[in-house]
Amino acid sequence: MSERRGAARHPASLRPRQWACAALWAALCVGMSAARAQTDEIQVYDAEITAPGHFNLTWHNNFTPSGRTEPAFPGGIVPEHALNGVPEWAYGVTPWFEAGLYLPVYTRTGDGELLFDAAKLRALFVVPDAHDRRFFYGINFELSYNTPHWDPSRYTGEMRGIVGVHLGRFDLILNPNVDTDYNGVGQLEFVPAVRVAWNSGDKLALALEEYADFGPLEHFKPSEQQSHTLFAVIDYGTASRGVEFGIGRGLTPASDTWVLKLMLMQDL
């Protein structure tokens, strides 16, 4: 469903002022490291944003029916049988900039305990009219405030690149992401995602998505310690209202065995 974010309709490419805004956010997200823990958002970004002056709500929910039985760090959340998610509140500021707020990030543990996990701010910069272009691109920045059971670092961030092509009914999208906890450039965590989708008309899309965690850029983890999860995904809906559902299978010992994801999207 290539229009789930709502494409802006203003021709342009990213100009120097826009790149300056993106560079400012990048400066906030450099000089860091990350210990990968849980995630509230399992999604490949496609450079499409909410139209200027409009709001959009995306409700993320992820459930792990079979996964790791130990937390990623002492005091963390056990992934198996945990449900985590977040409402993502987005506002289209310009044809090339969307601001977002994730609040509240939450988890229902396998023991039935409901936890508040985090809050996040997001700044997404894209080439306008991504849906109408053969080649599209963008970059997203996130800053997070975390509780101790969600992440061992109080403040973390993400830089998410967006590069993709529309080839007829097919989409190929790469998100080369890095996660951070502001502790050194060499320790940036490389966590890319990729999506290959086939679009059947304007409302239905079938896709394969792969999410990975290779470890710090300065020294990747051994292959058996890396996380790799392959999702079969279906999208249905329009630019103003849609749903995405996926079933993920872990491919390595460090991955959760099965993960389900559900996203509900609605313009406000």
Which role does the model predict for each range below?
Residues 1-16:
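N-terminal secretory signal peptides that target proteins for export/translocation
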Residues 16-19, 123:
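Hydrophobic alpha-helical segments, especially transmembrane helices
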Residues 36-267:
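Transmembrane beta-barrel domains of Gram-negative outer membranes and organellar outer membranes
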Residues 12-13, 21, 41:
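Intrinsic structural disorder/low-complexity segments
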Residues 14, 34-37:
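Glycine-centered signal
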Residues 21-31:
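Bacterial N-terminal signal peptides
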